């Protein structure tokens, strides 16, 4: 039995101790995004960030074995501080492009973030991305805790 689109869609919800605008900005500011994007223990660089609809980004992830894995995409929707939609593609493998939707909701003095990644192709790929995003979101929690405005 093959996996359905819903089976291969990743959805993660987290609550952050920061207002929606602060959480949203951490996705579109190069220095901030670079500080937390990627799984724990992985260094990332963002050589390209055009934070506008139709703008592109590129992230280079340095693995512990020294390999560099580039990810690139295009911003489809930027609706501050509520919604951010962008493509996510592993360079060199156009068949692995997916769509990420970040939705932010105010919850008192906190923010509920939902990350939905569609088009992952397989349950295994969904699970691998889930591990990576959960780790990156752990880093975002820590970053927002130590970098308050």
Give the location of each predicted region.
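Hydrophobic ligand-binding cavity/cleft-lining segments
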Residues: 1-43
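Intrinsic-disorder/low-complexity, polar/charged segments enriched in Ser/Thr/Lys/Arg/Asp/Glu/Gln
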Residues: 7-13, 20, 56, 70, ...
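Short beta-edge strand/loop motif at the mouth of beta-sheet-based domains
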Residues: 11-12, 31-68
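Hydrophobic/aromatic beta-strand elements that line small-molecule binding cavities or substrate pockets
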Residues: 14, 47, 71-76, 98-105
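Hydrophobic pocket/interface hotspot
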Residues: 23-24, 33, 57-59, 75, ...
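Contiguous, well-ordered beta-strand patches that form the walls/edges
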Residues: 66-78, 82-91
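Beta-strand/loop substructures that line and gate deep hydrophobic ligand-binding cavities in soluble
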Residues: 83-134
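Short, highly charged C-terminal tails/helix-capping segments
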Residues: 143-149
């Amino acid at each position: 039995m093959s996996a359905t689109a819903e089976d291969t869609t990743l959805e993660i919800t987290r609550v952050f101790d920061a207002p929606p605008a602060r959480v949203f900005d951490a996705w579109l500011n190069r220095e901030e995004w670079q500080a937390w994007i990627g799984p724990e223990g992985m260094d990332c660089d963002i050589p390209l960030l055009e934070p506008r609809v139709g703008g592109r980004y590129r992230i280079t992830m340095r693995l512990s074995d020294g390999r560099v894995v580039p990810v690139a995409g295009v911003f489809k929707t930027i609706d501050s501080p509520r919604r951010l939609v962008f493509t996510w593609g592993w360079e060199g493998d156009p068949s692995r492009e997916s769509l990420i939707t970040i939705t932010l909701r105010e919850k008192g003095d906190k923010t509920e973030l939902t990350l939905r990644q569609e088009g992952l192709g397989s349950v295994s790929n969904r699970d691998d991305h889930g591990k990576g995003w959960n780790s990156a979101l752990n880093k975002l929690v820590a970053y927002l805790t130590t970098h308050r405005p």
